[in-house]
Amino acid sequence: MRDLKTYLSVAPVLSTLWFGSLAGLLIEINRLFPDALTFPFFSF
């Protein structure tokens, strides 16, 4: 039961950090390439 409580307290923290960093990355990409439908570094 103690391990379950530890897991339930760690998972929200890790998901908050993950989604926060993902949102920050998307914000920075949109700041550097505003309104880009195709990104120049993905074109071959």
Swiss-Prot record:
The chain crosses the membrane at residues 7-27. The keyword Membrane applies. Disulfide bonds: none annotated. It is a single-pass membrane protein. The keyword Plastid applies. PANTHER family: PHOTOSYSTEM I REACTION CENTER SUBUNIT IX, PTHR36082. HAMAP family: PSI_PsaJ. This is Photosystem I reaction center subunit IX. It comes from Arabidopsis thaliana (Mouse-ear cress). The gene is psaJ.
